[in-house]
């Protein structure tokens, strides 16, 4: 194709099989029982897109399709006998545009469309889902204006979503920056957000919650960034307020499902840095935050106060690789803050080889040291996992 045109595509596939303890103590809902369940999930996704770009204009059109088949069943039976089966399909279209008016001004805008579908052969405990669960469309329109010179930067954007299930929601963001000294800048941002529950949140067998409401948010950020002694760094203070925040929590029967936790606030500070040591490039970050349920004044469950990350990357001829370390501090496994989960750190390794200009083969090992830890009470994290990816671009 012409040098101003790009055509690209990706395809991905994965299958996951896991076991968990579905036992329950005696309660008002029934006697105690002991049962180990197995989940089987297969996901496929495909994306195709085209991009045009020149010195002033960029336009990109992307289309994607994904499908997921999921089963939940006692490990004494098989997948074919599963009373919980969940077949979802998702179609998306996205059109993005930007035009550079002059050295200072850039305008952008676009549209996107998403259709979520639940196959009518899906079942939860052997029961079909309500007809309103089978299909949902969301159409979004957005626009952006940016200004920037050597001293000042500013941005204003707006978005309108028309969700077939939850109605229309309008959100916007604005920000400004001041480069008060060469290599140092002070910035501030404010924005509103809207997130509809996914089909998995609403209807996934054994854990979906069809009563979920959309999540709405307001975010405030104050940033100072600069470059000192060869290190590019950024210090950010933020406050995020949520209405009907969606979070995993136990229901009245002790089963973990997505829940609206009401009003929540997360305040924090994050320090990020980028630097090089010889042929290695590094990205590091450290964060401290206070995630709070405003109704109870308790720490939000499953969200830690402390976190850190380090990623080191290298490239040599057709080879590239990265080694990363992720740390999450202690957090609570319940809304009452009575059960504490320990902190953990995980290493990941990735390598890639550019076979040809259009072909690349990559491999990744997650949880390299096979660390044992829990993501929530009674749910151990994945063991060491291996991934292979083949990318092709025209």
Task: Describe every region a protein language model picked out.
Residues 3-7, 44, 55-61, 103-107, ...:
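Outer-envelope beta-barrel architecture signal
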Residues 4-55, 59, 63-90:
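Flexible loop and strand-edge segments within Gram-negative outer membrane beta-barrel domains
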Residues 9-11, 61-63, 107-111, 156, ...:
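Membrane-embedded beta-strand positions of outer-membrane beta-barrel proteins
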Residues 13-17, 54-56, 65-69, 113-119, ...:
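Transmembrane beta-strands of outer-membrane beta-barrel pores
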Residues 27-28, 32-49, 134-136, 165, ...:
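Outer-membrane beta-barrel signature, preferentially recognizing the C-terminal barrel domain
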Residues 38-45, 65-155, 162, 336-338:
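Outer-membrane beta-barrel transmembrane domain signature of Gram-negative proteins
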Residues 103-107, 148-154, 239-241, 259-336, ...:
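Gram-negative outer-membrane beta-barrel transporters
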Residues 223-225, 274, 382-394:
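Outer-membrane beta-barrel "beta-signal"
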